[in-house]
Amino acid sequence: ILAWNRTYKVPYVIVRPTNNYGIGQYVEKLIPKVCKFLSIGRKIPLHNQGEPYRMWLHAKDTAKAITTIIESGKTNEIYNISGNFEQKNIDTVKKILDLYSKEFVHSKNEDILDLSIVRDGQDVRYSVDDTKLQALGWKTECNFDDELPEIVKFYKDNFIW
């Protein structure tokens, strides 16, 4: 895109959101995948012992960020959308376990989690700065811990995989 702009003067706006979450997310993404594996009784595979960090951003906040960029952003700019909520994958999975069912509360991690997978080259962390977007008046409205119970309930109640 940047090459096309330099060569042909094609205008652009690039958005770079972090990991989105919400109801209707693709089944192979972390939150629905964990719910799927719990529903079918499979161990949950976590790369690199679940230590990598991820920034989470609700899809509603992503949509509002893009609307803000369309209405107030500048052409030929790049906007990061982060949401500024970050945690380890293992911590996300533990929160889902706590919400999913009481039967997992007293389970040992080794009974539920497969922490043996080493993924060479996996990003340990990728954080982005969305100061430019915030300067347009955008801020997150959704809180990960507040939204997660409804999302887990949706996947649990609508298990069709």
Model-predicted regions and their roles:
Residues I1, V34, L133-Q134:
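Structural element of the ATP-grasp superfamily
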Residues Y12-I14, P45-L46:
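Conserved active-site beta-strand element of glycosyltransferases/polysaccharide synthases
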Residues L2, P32, K94, D98:
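Active-site phosphate/pyrophosphate- and oxyanion-stabilizing loops and adjacent acidic/basic residues
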